[in-house]
Amino acid sequence: MTVARNRAGAGPGKGSPISSFADKTFTDPARIRNFCIIAHIDHGKSTLADRMLQLTGVVEERQMRAQYLDRMDIERERGITIKAQNVRLPWKVGDEEFVIHLIDTPGHVDFTYEVSRALEACEGAVLLVDAAQGIEAQTLANLYLAMEKDLTIIPVLNKIDLPAADPDRYAEEIAHITGCEPGDVLRVSGKTGIGVKELLDEVVRQVPAPVGDPDGPARAMIFDSVYDAYRGVVTYVRVVDGRISPREKITMMSTGTTHDLIEVGIISPEPKASIGLGVGEVGYLITGVKDVRQSRVGDTVTAARGGATEPLVGYRDPKPMVYSGLYPLDGSDYPVLRDALDKLRLNDAALAYEPETSVALGFGFRCGFLGLLHMEITRDRLEREFGLELISTSPNVVYRVVMEDGSEHVVTNPSYWPEGKIREVYEPMVKCTIIAPSEFIGAIMELCQNRRGELGGMDYLSETRVELRYEMPMGEIMFDFFDALKSRTKGYASLDYEESGEQQADLVKVDILLQGEAVDAFSSIVHRSAAGAYGGRMTSKLRELIPRQQFEVPIQAAIGSKIISRENIRAIRKDVLAKCYGGDISRKRKLLEKQKEGKKRMKTIGRVEVPQEAFVAALSSESVGDKPKK
C-alpha cells in the first residue's frame, strides 16, 4: 500500500516538476481556494479535472489516464461520476503560491445528495456547460443548490473546440440565468486545454478564501467516506475551525463515539500522509473503524478533549425515494448478498435495506434507493464486485394509506397493502423540470398529461429552448418516463426532479393470480384508470413466459376479488391412444376418461412452478415482443 502511495507522484513529470508547497499542510487560509465543478452528465467535467491535474503538475504524464478521478470501473465504463472525489492542487499566480482544493461532483439527478455534500465543503463553484448543448435541467438544479449556499459562481463554456459549438448563443443563455454579462463567461476546452490556465487564475481571483477560527476547538465536516479493504473507513473532511493532527482522539458529534486518529493526510491525487490539517483544508482521516455508519456524511468531527459543543449545520440524512426487492437467484447466496450490501453501505450512505421473504422468490432484501439510476448502479455493483446473480422486483414508491377506522399504514411493498376498507391513499409527488427544444413542447405536454402531470409553468430560456415545470406523481416517472421523454424529443430533453410532498390519489393494488393463488412478486400498486391496462399487459406477458403444463392454467389480474383480466395457458395433451393399434372403441374411451379424471385431479392439486426467467422477464419493463430471440 505505502509503496504505491509513495511512488505515485514521486519524481517530477515531463511538464513542470511536482511542487512541494502544496504537500505541506497548515497553509494560511488566505492562500486556500475550495471549489467544485457543477455540470450535467457528459458536459466534460472529469476531462476538465484531468487537464487541471496535468497543468498543476500533480500527475505525471506517464501516469495520466482519462477520467483520472473516476476510480470505479462502473464510473469509467458509463462515463459518469458517482462518488464525489477531491484533490489538492498547487497553483501560482505571479509569485504568489496558492493551494486549490477541487471537489469533483456527480452530475446525475439521483446523486443530488452527493452534490449537496460537496457544495458544503466549498466556497465557489464552476458552472460548466457544454458549448454544443447548452444548459440542461440537472445543471440548473445543482446551480440553484449552489446559489442557496451563497457560493461564488464562475460560469464556463466547455468543448469550444467542437465544430458544433455555439459559444455566443449559450453564453447569452447562461448570462440570462446567472445574471452576469455574456462577456464574463469563460471559454475553455477540457480536451485540448485551451483556457484552463485562465480558469484556474479566475478561481483564485473570484472564489473567497475559507473563513474559520484557527485557535478555536477543532471542527471538521465529513463530506464523504469510503471503505478501504486494508485500512478500514477513510473519511474525507473539510476543516472549518481549529486543527486536526494524527495520534489525537476525535469524537463524531452525531453519534458521540470516540476514535483514535491513526493517519491524517491529503489527496494529491493519490493519498499522502501529513502532519495534520488546518482551517479551510480538505483531506482524509483514518481511524481504523470498520463500519462506515460510524463516520456519517454530514457529521461534525471534533477533538475528544476540549472539543466543540456546537456541531456544524447543514446536514440531513438522505431519504430513499424508491423501493425494490433484491433476491439472489440461488437461495444459498443470501448471506453473501447480506455481506455485500453491508459493504456497499460503507460507501453509500443513502442505501437502506431490510430483510424480507417472498413466497415466490425466497429470502432477499427490500432496498431503498434515491432513484432509478442509483438502483441500477447498486445492482450492477453487487453483481460485479461480489459476483452475485440477482432478481430485482419492480420498483415502487412509498404510499400512505388511511383506513376507515382512522389507522394509518406506510406501504413500501405491494404485499403489505392493507386489506379492508380504505378511506384514502396518499402518494409522493415530485416537481419536474424539463428543458428541451421548443419544437417538442406538444409531445412533452401530451406525455406528462398521460402520466397525470399538472403544468406548473413554462419559460423560454432562448428562442429555441424552453423550460417546462410539472407536478407529477413519483410513481409515474419511476419506470420508463425518462426513456419515453428522450424518444419523443429525439434525445434532446433533459429532466430533473425533486420531491414536493404528497397528494391524495385513487390507487388500487393489482394482484396477479396463477390458478387462483396470488403471486406476491407480481403485485403492483397502480392508479385505478391504468389498472386494466397493467393487468392485461402482465397476463399476456406471463402467458408467453410460463411453460405449458399437463392441465390448463388460468392467469388472472384482480383488484381485491374483482377479476379485471384473464388469459389461459392451454394444456399439453399426452396422446394416450398411441399404444392402441385399432382395437375396440370402448378401450379407447376408457383411456380418455381416465386421462380426463387425471387432468381434473391435477387441476385441483397441481402447482405451477414459475421459472426464474419468467420472473426476470416479467419484472423488466420491456414487453415480450421487444425481447430478442435467443
Curated annotation (Swiss-Prot):
Q: Which InterPro entries match?
A: EF-4 (IPR006297), EFG_III/V (IPR035647), EFG_V-like (IPR000640), EFTu-like_2 (IPR004161), G_TR_CS (IPR031157), LepA_C_sf (IPR038363), LepA_CTD (IPR013842), LepA_IV (IPR035654)
Q: What is the membrane topology here?
A: Peripheral membrane protein
GO CC terms of this entry: plasma membrane
Q: Does the keyword GTP-binding apply?
A: yes
Report the residue ranges that make up the tr-type G domain in this protein: 30-211
Q: Which PANTHER family match?
A: TRANSLATION FACTOR GUF1 HOMOLOG, CHLOROPLASTIC, TRANSLATION FACTOR GUF1-RELATED
NCBIfam families attached to this UniProt entry = lepA, small_GTP
UniProt-recorded name of the protein? Elongation factor 4
Q: What is the primary gene name for this protein?
A: lepA
